[in-house]
Amino acid sequence: MALLFPLLAALVMTSYSPVGSLGCDLPQNHGLLSRNTLVLLHQMRRISPFLCLKDRRDFRFPQEMVKGSQLQKAHVMSVLHEMLQQIFSLFHTERSSAAWNMTLLDQLHTGLHQQLQHLETCLLQVVGEGESAGAISSPALTLRRYFQGIRVYLKEKKYSDCAWEVVRMEIMKSLFLSTNMQERLRSKDRDLGSS
């Protein structure tokens, strides 16, 4: 529990920068939507993670996708888009509706939908600039496998409260890692712009 608050604070701080610096003309409110997503996921906690220690699972988030040193805009946008699409899909089921507070869940759906629309616009622009289509398709397949593992886990655990709590924490962790990737690309773009 003590580790959760610094993680949330780091997520909020790293998502403060405007996404426009990624080379896309995304609306300024994209950073606000990202922060809201993380805050909503934090607020959705229904039970203490300590009650669910026996249910923990290593979902093997594909960290190689977010930790590379040669980041391309198309890759970053593809990873972010696919992650948000998969999170939206995961939390937009009948089973998730039964597990979570409907007001918070509706707010999460709305925020994710808005972020997806913004990222789709950005992806079209980046691909139009000639970045590799391979930089887009490879992360999508890898992330689909990762999220399929999460879905299988939920089914195995019969969509229990603890299973959903473990998944909620995993989603927050994966968003944190992708936010770090986004920040590294922003820094790289700033460094290139000042050279």
UniProtKB/Swiss-Prot annotation:
Signal peptide: 1-21
Gene3D superfamilies xrefs: 1.20.1250.10
GO BP: adaptive immune response; B cell activation involved in immune response; cellular response to virus; defense response to virus; humoral immune response; natural killer cell activation involved in immune response; regulation of cell cycle; response to exogenous dsRNA
Chief localization: secreted
SUPFAM superfamilies: 4-helical cytokines
GO cellular-component term (any): extracellular space
PANTHER family referenced in this protein's UniProt entry, alphabetically: INTERFERON OMEGA-1, TYPE I INTERFERON
Homology family: Belongs to the alpha/beta interferon family.
Name used for this protein in its record: Interferon omega-1
Classification lineage: Eukaryota, Metazoa, Chordata, Craniata, Vertebrata
